[in-house]
Amino acid sequence: MAMKIPKSGYNRFMKEGAQHFKGTDEAVQRNIEACTELASQIRSAYGPNGMNKMVINHIEKLFVTNDAATILKELEIQHPAARIIIMATEMQEKQIGDNTNTVVILAAALLEHAANLIHMGMTPQEVAAGYEQAAEKALEILPTLVVKEATDMKNIEEVRQYIRSAITSKQYDNEDIIADLVAKACVTTCPANSFNFNVDNIRICKIIGSGVHTSTVMNGMVFKRGAEGEIREARDARIAVYTCPFDLTQTETKGTVLIENADELRNFSKGEEAEVEEQVKAIADNGVKVVVAAGKFGDMYLHFLNKYKIMAVRLTSKFDLRRLCRTVGAQPQARICAPAVNLLGHCDSVAVQEIGDENVVVFDKKSETGKVATIIIRGSSQSRIDDVERAVDDAVNTYKALTKDGKLLAGAGAVEIELAKEIESFGAKAPGLEQYAIKKFAHALETLPKAIAENAGMPTTETLTKLYAEHVAGKKNAGIDIWKRETMDAVVNNIFDLYAGKRLAIKLATDAASTILKVDQIIMSKQATGGPKPRGPKAQDEDDDGMA
């Protein structure tokens, strides 16, 4: 029997192929390098002049976007430290829907400055403690920098100003068009108590062709399909909705019928036809002009629906069916019957229209503010439309956040410079080694306006110097004007940042950086090989809000 020499160190406890990194040089520095490398890919996408990234994911779907959450999600990054920052951006996306780039860039800047402090002799724990003190101070100062509060969420002009900045960072040059569409859609569907606003009530229909400037918004719903029968339009229509197929039910058992002469053949389906006509006539007698069903329409039912001038629309998605019921005020029926009048929905116009080369069914509630609005997005390519959709989502989420907390800050990098100035002076007065980390926190905040200037092609050092001079002179709202390539008053130019979004971004970025700094060991088991990849959860409607 051959002698087996045991491994030395930590590897003796681990399986073959496991990896282990320990200490400042191996673990902490590796993590910092991974996170700064990640942020370097995202930094050029920050701000109105940010560059787009072209990402092709594992199923070869193409994304052209500058949205950090989308880029990081589709890259499928595996590094454990980088994953911590990605989880922070996912939380920001989930709670606010904007400022995801801010989280990545700020967290990486904090780690980059921490690497310098560690190299000078500070411990990661001291750096993390200093960062936490600085973040606490920043969150204390932030409420004093509020410049405006959104009060009237039913005023389209006012709402347009507030959501414009969220769109500008995604769709520069189209921000006015998109802001107008989103403001109209949000105000139309906003309930009496704006706190109860539901983002699921803003629907998006994407149709390739023309340009973004031809996009429209309407009060109602649009479905990318045609009508089933011959009737293609109904005005002032009562609508019956069925969750079952609009067809004859078939029994599971098969039967055999013996037909001996022509009369028996002629009379074979006469009773069936009479029954179907009776059902459709009863529906028509209730004033129904449109029938919507979740399944297919049988030929015989379609014949009699055409005879009684009833429009037939098929929706295959149960989620679309629920939203339509909410839009028109109908109660869905589980079987074919003539529903009572109070169970029917109503719509001013239901019509099949051709937009581009696509047939769509439009449920238009012209006469009233409805519960659901649809934004029809046009564009020259699928990736272009998808990016506009992401900008619309950000704007709608901004409106939602404003209904919860209406406080606004000056945008264009003004808040970051003011915070950096205040925290720098706070660090100068702080005792102990933490003061160096506090000052570095202030320098990390400068990274955000610096990225805006850099992506706009402006000299960064000169721009930051001018900004600091303005803020020291008491102009707290001085930000970067990328058009005139100089400083400006962000509030006068209606450039705002969400208070809630900025607050959460600072908190998440600091927490992510502190967590990574406090890791001194990385232990990775050998990856399992062979066998299929575990299946994820069954796909659901991504916009479903769990309605019953």
UniProtKB/Swiss-Prot annotation:
Main location (coarse class): cytoplasm
Q: PROSITE patterns of this UniProt entry?
A: TCP1_1 (PS00750), TCP1_2 (PS00751)
User: Quick check: keyword Metal-binding in the entry?
Assistant: no
Where does it reside? Cytoplasm
Name the gene that codes for it. Answer: cct-8
Task: Set out the biological process GO terms recorded for this chain's protein.
Answer: protein folding
Give the disulfide map.
none
Query: What protein family does this chain belong to?
Result: Belongs to the TCP-1 chaperonin family.
MF GO annotations = ATP binding; ATP hydrolysis activity; ATP-dependent protein folding chaperone; unfolded protein binding
**Phenotype seen when the gene is deleted:** Low and diffuse subcellular localization of pgl-1 in embryos rather than confined to granules in somatic cells.
Question: One GO CC term of this entry?
Answer: chaperonin-containing T-complex
Origin organism lineage: Eukaryota, Metazoa, Ecdysozoa, Nematoda, Chromadorea
- Could you tell me what this protein does? Molecular chaperone; assists the folding of proteins upon ATP hydrolysis. Known to play a role, in vitro, in the folding of actin and tubulin. Required for correct subcellular localization of pgl-1.
What this protein is called in its record is: T-complex protein 1 subunit theta
Q: How does it assemble?
A: Heterooligomeric complex.
**Keywords, A to Z?**
ATP-binding, Chaperone, Cytoplasm, Nucleotide-binding
A Pfam family assignment: Cpn60_TCP1
According to the record, the residues making up region (Disordered) are: 527-548
Kindly give the SUPFAM superfamilies that the UniProt entry links to this protein: GroEL apical domain-like (SSF52029), GroEL equatorial domain-like (SSF48592), GroEL-intermediate domain like (SSF54849)
